[in-house]
């Protein structure tokens, strides 16, 4: 498969974003997949246009977006995105939407059509912390996952799409002993394992849900 993997620019006055740092270190061939890479701005207003232009000028079987989830302690494939922008902080354009629909003609939610349980289990099988997430938040990460679902629904019926959140890396949590992090090389290994699990097969039917 031809897979586009995206990461984000730093945001919230940080100098680094582990999503893009990890994406840049991915091999260009992973398993049977050819990997292209794209850096996205942390901008509600810009990401849609960039994604639209990229998909219009290239054929991709899969788009997999990667984002930072500070405070998480695992690599977490996302199951679903919701049709809301509700930003706790401004984005890099100083834009802070509150309770705004992403697409007025879109569904209330879009589920990733990637094998998210198989991807999660593949991370775990590498001895790395992995978990299936049921919330991508309401910032630009959720926005991108939702927009990809919208494009698949309205324009690219054969497109497969998904999102993975990754933790901070250690240099982001210096002096913050209670904040989890993960070495960059482990994030790269986890993303590689997750990408290797992407296939045309049905997802695994295993218990990776939560009770709360």
Curated annotation (Swiss-Prot):
<dbReference type="InterPro" id="IPR033693">
    <property type="entry name" value="PGPEP1_Glu_AS"/>
</dbReference>
<dbReference type="InterPro" id="IPR029762">
    <property type="entry name" value="PGP-I_bact-type"/>
</dbReference>
<keyword id="KW-0645">Protease</keyword>
<keyword id="KW-0378">Hydrolase</keyword>
<dbReference type="InterPro" id="IPR033694">
    <property type="entry name" value="PGPEP1_Cys_AS"/>
</dbReference>
<dbReference type="InterPro" id="IPR000816">
    <property type="entry name" value="Peptidase_C15"/>
</dbReference>
<keyword id="KW-0963">Cytoplasm</keyword>
<feature type="active site">
    <location>
        <position position="78"/>
    </location>
</feature>
<dbReference type="GO" id="GO:0016920">
    <property type="term" value="F:pyroglutamyl-peptidase activity"/>
</dbReference>
<keyword id="KW-0788">Thiol protease</keyword>
<feature type="active site">
    <location>
        <position position="165"/>
    </location>
</feature>
<dbReference type="GO" id="GO:0006508">
    <property type="term" value="P:proteolysis"/>
</dbReference>
<dbReference type="InterPro" id="IPR016125">
    <property type="entry name" value="Peptidase_C15-like"/>
</dbReference>
<comment type="similarity">
    <text>Belongs to the peptidase C15 family.</text>
</comment>
<dbReference type="InterPro" id="IPR036440">
    <property type="entry name" value="Peptidase_C15-like_sf"/>
</dbReference>
<protein>
    <recommendedName>
        <fullName>Pyrrolidone-carboxylate peptidase</fullName>
        <ecNumber>3.4.19.3</ecNumber>
    </recommendedName>
</protein>
<feature type="active site">
    <location>
        <position position="141"/>
    </location>
</feature>
<comment type="subunit">
    <text>Homotetramer.</text>
</comment>
<comment type="function">
    <text>Removes 5-oxoproline from various penultimate amino acid residues except L-proline.</text>
</comment>
<dbReference type="Pfam" id="PF01470">
    <property type="entry name" value="Peptidase_C15"/>
</dbReference>
<dbReference type="GO" id="GO:0005829">
    <property type="term" value="C:cytosol"/>
</dbReference>
């Amino acid at each position: 498969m031809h897979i586009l993997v995206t990461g984000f620019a730093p945001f919230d006055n940080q100098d680094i974003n582990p999503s893009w740092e990890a994406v840049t270190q991915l091999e260009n061939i992973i398993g049977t997949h050819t990997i292209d890479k794209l850096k996205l701005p942390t901008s509600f207003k810009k990401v849609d246009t960039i994604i639209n232009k990229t998909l219009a000028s290239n054929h991709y079987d899969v788009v997999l977006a990667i984002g930072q989830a500070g405070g998480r302690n695992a690599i977490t494939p996302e199951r679903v995105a919701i049709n809301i922008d509700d930003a706790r902080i401004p984005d890099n354009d100083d834009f802070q939407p509150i309770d705004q629909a992403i697409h007025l003609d879109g569904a209330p939610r879009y589920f990733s059509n990637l094998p998210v349980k198989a991807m999660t289990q593949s991370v775990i099988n590498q001895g790395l912390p992995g978990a299936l997430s049921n919330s991508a938040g309401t910032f630009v990460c959720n926005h991108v996952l939702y927009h990809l679902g919208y494009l698949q629904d309205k324009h690219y019926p054969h497109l497969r799409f998904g999102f993975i959140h990754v933790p901070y890396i250690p240099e982001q949590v210096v002096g913050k002993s209670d904040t989890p992090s993960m070495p960059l090389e482990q994030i790269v290994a986890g993303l590689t394992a997750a990408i290797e699990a992407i296939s045309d097969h049905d997802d695994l039917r295993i218990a990776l849900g939560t009770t709360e």
